[in-house]
Amino acid sequence: AIAANVGGTITMIGTPPNVIVTGALATAGLPTFGFFEFAYIGIPLSVIILVWMLTIGRRMLPAHNAGEMDEEAVQAAKEEAGASDDKAPKSKTKMWISGLIMVGVVVCMALELPTVPLQTAAVTGAILCVITGCLKEKEAYAGIDWVTIFLFAGMLSVATAMEKTGAGKLIADTVVGMMGANPSPYLLTAVLFLISNVLTQFMSNTASAALLAPIGISIAQEVGCDPKPVLMALGIAASMAFATPMATPPNTLVLGPGNFTFNDYVKVGVPLCLISWVACVIIIPIFWPFH
């Protein structure tokens, strides 16, 4: 579960918050993140957490006997995570075709071709999967994460409304004012990371990113710094959902089989959240300077 959460931060499509913060920048008319740009923070973060879990962190892991599989809970978590039916027969030909389609889509996204935008590459790949028979139409429809789509669409409207009405500036002025005159961008980034990270433990990481992304842009513009490092911190913080079983589908999926308790997640997750917080505050400004 920990590896799934951290590994998703390496690419734009690895986790919904990455897409959300990229869309927020595009809506504001600002330069956006590239497909693999998230790897600059995602890979170091993955290595740091891997080393921690292999050394000190493993001592914190619970040593429970395996629990009984709650099939309903597992199936619900799989559906939320977009997993396919394990009992369906597998076709090697379709596996190769779908693999080639995925490689083609990723290459197009990585090259950032002006004639093939990210959304065009993604939709084309999905259509090819249906045309080639790798997916049935109903399976493709069921695989769409409607929550993310509607949250993303709603976020665009909210961001525009906050800009037009001045609500974004009001919130930014309030937050900045609480930190004194001329607050450091490092301090702002650290505080916003904590807010996003705490929220994502108790609500969808997609929702927390959608809620804070427009506010993060307003705050960055208020203090005169580049919004990209602030948005990157918000997005990564929303994906560092380790401390509760309901934070992300991977956490929920292993709850029953691992026979874990709520306190197990807190014991293992809180140190990981603090480590990721310190690492991001140090690493993010290196690749995305504030000025």
Where are these regions (language model features)?
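Juxtamembrane and boundary regions of transmembrane helices in multi-pass small-molecule transporters
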Residues: 2-3, 7-80, 223, 232-291
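Hydrophobic transmembrane alpha-helices of multi-pass small-molecule transporters
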Residues: 37-173, 189, 272-273, 277, ...
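Cytoplasmic-side transmembrane-helix entry/capping segments in multi-pass membrane proteins
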Residues: 1-2, 142-151, 208, 212
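Short helix-coil transition sites and intra-membrane helix breaks within transmembrane domains
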Residues: 7-17, 114-118, 161-168, 198-211, ...
